[in-house]
């Protein structure tokens, strides 16, 4: 026990000790369960479901069912996959069921572990969501594990991007021995039947990516009919690669948007100007914060090129944002590191995984500025119609759990943000991998030369080598060095997940050399000798030392380095790992010490000769710890602000859902509250409002009128919420400046945000009444009434992924973005729209046409 405590920490050792009795119960049931006929398994599932449906205390009943349910899943896996859950995998499953994070090393069978709690929690008929990092893994896991669930009588759905959804097709029959051998990396699509999004969510267990779950939630809060809702609540989630999803992507909000913005000529013009500005003279770059600041000389030069006397006046302020964005695109964002150009489009590269992220776009005009820089088609800027961070989305679940190979280093954050304990699960077999100390070189060139020589040596011995790089650019550069040494190799640039899976699965073959971005092929086991295993090849590679993992650069997060190391030494196999780093690497260059460079220069060490030095290793670790702390603070800061928005978001979305489901009485109550509000202000105005409403009701008929009011409320809610999101975004950009006046930015954000939210609620009733006044009778070709002067609102939804604004500029950016003059919220609206109840021009904050094109045009300088 003391050994476990020392190895896995008190919390983990306590949990493991407490599960011993349950694991013993599951094992004791094995003989009885193995005696069951295949047809008995779905019957058992129906029996469990029946017990739960009749239970007054479902949680207790679930715990009573647990040992038998886990034993059933274990036997189903044996019969369908030829795999039996180890005892440590049962412990991992118990941790997930308890709403904790299971840290399980690579190769310990996390995908199989998830079947245990997924089956148990799906019995309650509220659904289980299993979250993966990409579409490929969602499909792969559904096909492989679908055999188990189907055997037990459960249905399985898959949600993928581009609104593609599947159900596991139990009717497809074939000899599936090959599927069990290659299913870890190759998907047999015959087992996936295309279906609707709703049907995929209605399945007992649904596989999908974190982005799709989040976007579907946002889309569900934009629908105008109950029939269009797809999600059915947030019951239990198992997050695979939980550190990647809940930590690495935590600062990146999901945004669903509609198109808006400046013409592409604007972006091209500012790109031409940015090209003529010189670094350190006209602008400065902060590499740690990935930010730029214009110098006085740069501003003067830009003003001259623009032909503007002063860009910080009311007429010129709109140029500031475009200028800063163009310079940032030029100086901070690098092709083949931050993005690639593919098929005439700028595609973002995930900084943690190296994977391409098609469909996602940077906001604030950054993406458009990069498109101008690369000479591809410039898409329009977007306006946010809804947004949420992963931090707040995943906190919707009644029970949340996760699994990964590397969670312990972030245990504090998991506990503070999500209330999740990390349980370190022992490996089934001892890890015998050798982790060598880092080799440090003076230059990147010297480092790559040394790597090429080392790989050649290992290659001649028959040792398979997996080389991890941090970017596509470094992948291709290292490939040149290996070609010079005559080493045959495969490059993985994370451009095709499925192909990537097939290649990485063979990285353990004799003499195989694979260069991959650090996270490529995550979720795929690398088996010595290849996959499927050939015994002679396995024995040869094992004798040659197993898989050698060579890291070419330290990542900002220690977890990513540990994940790369974890590719070697699975299930007690031989293996070795080592990092080759140089003083020119980004981590050392930006955060490292000048003393190291001076020391290596003083001793005259050749550039391709390494040194092993404790001081330098400590400097590396210190730099990583600094960055991790910096990112933790940034994520905490993001969450503090999003918590304010989350409270408002819940109110708006709950009210919207209520209106979707509202009956006649509830809609009548809303109309009455509008009339009452007007009467309180002015009895004559209230009477006029009542007349207008009754007049429209008579024209349309009671039923059609109330349905039109429902649509108006939904539309007005969406329009005002979009405006409110924009206003809150601008508020966020400006509150940091209030710190100079000894005021706490987050307190100011909460206070002003609440005032703006109350104004929005007040404006909603005004706008609903205003739009009711514009209702006209339907034409002969139309089935429903329409609003005068307006078409049915259309929305082009653009999936967007935006970086948060941690270090914001001045509040004038709000003006600069749209090129609008500032108008007081209580001023008459410049669009001139007349309030039919009063005969006067609407106040700006209450204007019923606030999002109409004529409204926006009238505000342009």
Label every model-predicted segment.
Residues 1-604, 654:
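Conserved P-loop NTPase motor core
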Residues 11-14, 61, 608-611, 615, ...:
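Non-transmembrane, amphipathic alpha-helical segments
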Residues 20, 27, 459, 628, ...:
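Short amphipathic alpha-helical segments with heptad-repeat character
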Residues 22, 29, 36, 44, ...:
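Heptad-repeat coiled-coil/leucine-zipper interface motif in alpha-helices
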Residues 66-74, 96, 206, 294-296, ...:
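Core structural elements
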Residues 160, 421-424, 612, 617-628, ...:
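Long, non-coiled-coil amphipathic alpha-helical linker/lever segments
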Residues 277, 539-694, 704-705, 725:
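C-terminal helicase module of SF1/SF2 nucleic-acid helicases/translocases
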Residues 626, 651, 655-861:
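Acidic/negatively charged segments and metal-coordination signatures
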């Amino acid at each position: 026990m003391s050994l476990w405590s020392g190895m896995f920490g008190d919390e983990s050792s306590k949990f493991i000790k407490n599960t011993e009795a349950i694991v013993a119960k599951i094992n004791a049931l094995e003989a009885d369960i193995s005696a069951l006929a295949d047809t008995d398994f779905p019957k058992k599932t129906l029996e469990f479901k029946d017990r739960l449906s009749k239970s007054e205390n479902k949680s207790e009943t679930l715990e009573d069912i647990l040992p038998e349910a886990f034993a059933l899943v274990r036997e189903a896996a044996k019969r369908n996959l030829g795999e039996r859950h180890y005892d440590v995998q049962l412990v991992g499953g118990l941790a997930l069921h308890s709403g904790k994070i299971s840290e399980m090393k690579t190769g310990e069978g996390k995908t199989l572990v998830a079947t245990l709690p997924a089956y148990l929690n799906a019995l309650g008929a509220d659904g289980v969501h299993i979250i993966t990092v990409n579409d490929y893994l969602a499909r792969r896991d559904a096909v492989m594990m679908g055999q188990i669930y189907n055997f037990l009588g459960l249905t399985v759905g898959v949600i993928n991007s581009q609104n593609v959804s599947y159900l596991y097709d139990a009717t497809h029959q074939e000899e599936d021995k090959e599927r069990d051998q290659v299913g870890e990396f190759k998907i047999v699509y015959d087992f996936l039947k295309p279906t609707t999004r709703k049907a995929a969510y209605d399945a007992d267990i649904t596989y999908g990516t974190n982005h799709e779950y989040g976007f579907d939630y946002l889309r569900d809060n934009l629908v105008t009919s109950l029939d269009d809702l797809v999600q059915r609540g947030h019951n239990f989630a198992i997050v695979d690669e939980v550190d990647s999803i809940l930590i690495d992507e935590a600062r990146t909000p999901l945004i669903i948007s509609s198109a808006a913005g400046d013409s592409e000529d604007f972006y091209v013009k500012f790109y031409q100007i940015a090209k003529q500005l010189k670094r350190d003279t006209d602008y400065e770059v902060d590499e740690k914060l990935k930010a730029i600041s214009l110098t006085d000389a740069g501003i003067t030069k830009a003003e001259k090129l623009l032909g503007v006397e002063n860009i910080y006046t009311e007429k010129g302020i709109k140029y500031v944002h475009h200028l800063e964005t163009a310079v940032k695109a030029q100086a901070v964002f690098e092709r083949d590191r931050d993005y690639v150009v593919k098929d005439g489009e700028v595609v973002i590269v995930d900084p943690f995984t190296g994977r391409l992220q098609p469909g996602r776009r940077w906001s604030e005009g950054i993406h458009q500025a990069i498109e101008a820089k690369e000479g591809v088609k410039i898409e329009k800027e977007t306006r946010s119609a809804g947004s949420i961070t992963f931090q707040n989305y995943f906190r919707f679940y009644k029970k949340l759990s996760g699994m990964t190979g590397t969670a312990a280093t972030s245990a504090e954050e998991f506990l503070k943000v999500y209330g999740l304990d990390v349980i370190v699960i022992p490996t089934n077999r001892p890890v015998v991998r050798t982790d060598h100390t880092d080799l440090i070189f003076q230059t990147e060139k010297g480092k790559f030369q040394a790597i090429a020589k080392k790989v050649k040596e290992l290659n001649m011995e028959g040792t398979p080598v997996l080389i991890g790089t941090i970017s596509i650019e470094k992948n291709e550069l290292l490939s040149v060095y290996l070609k010079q040494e005559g080493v045959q190799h495969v490059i993985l640039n994370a451009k095709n997940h499925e192909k990537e899976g097939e290649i990485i699965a063979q990285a353990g073959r004799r003499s195989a050399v694979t260069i991959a971005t650090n996270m490529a092929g995550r979720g795929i086991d690398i088996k010595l000798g290849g996959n499927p295993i050939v015994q002679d090849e396995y024995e040869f590679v094992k004798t040659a030392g197993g898989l050698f993992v060579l890291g070419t650069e330290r990542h900002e997060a220690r977890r990513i380095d540990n994940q790369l190391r974890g590719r070697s030494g699975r299930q007690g196999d031989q293996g070795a790992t080592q990092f080759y780093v140089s003083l020119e690497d980004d981590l050392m260059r930006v955060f490292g010490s000048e003393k190291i460079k001076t020391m290596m220069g003083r001793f005259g060490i050749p550039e391709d000769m390494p040194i092993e030095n404790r001081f330098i290793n400590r400097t590396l670790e210190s730099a990583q710890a600094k960055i991790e702390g910096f990112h933790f603070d940034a994520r905490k800061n993001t969450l503090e602000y999003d918590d304010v928005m989350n409270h408002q978001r819940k109110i708006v979305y709950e009210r919207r859902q209520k209106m979707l489901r509202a009956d006649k009485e509830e809609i009548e109550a809303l109309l009455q509250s509008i009339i009452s509000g007007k009467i309180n202000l002015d009895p004559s105005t209230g009477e006029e409002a009542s007349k207008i409403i009754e007049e429209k009701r008579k024209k349309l008929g009671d039923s059609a009128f109330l349905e039109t009011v429902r649509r108006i409320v939904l539309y007005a809610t969406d329009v005002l919420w979009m405006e409110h999101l924009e206003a809150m975004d601008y508020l966020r950009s400006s509150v940091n400046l209030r710190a100079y006046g000894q005021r706490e930015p987050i307190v100011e954000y909460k206070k002003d945000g609440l005032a703006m939210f109350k104004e929005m609620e007040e404006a909603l009733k005004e706008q609903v009444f205003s739009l009711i006044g514009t209702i006209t009778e339907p034409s002969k070709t139309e089935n429903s009434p329409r609003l005068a002067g307006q078409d049915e609102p259309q929305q082009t939804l653009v999936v967007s992924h935006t970086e948060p604004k941690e270090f914001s500029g001045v509040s004038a950016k709000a003006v600069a973005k749209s090129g609008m003059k500032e108008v007081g919220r209580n001023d008459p609206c410049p669009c001139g729209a007349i309030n039919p109840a009063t005969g006067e021009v609407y106040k700006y904050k209450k204007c019923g046409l606030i999002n109409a094109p004529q409204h926006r045009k009238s505000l342009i300088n």
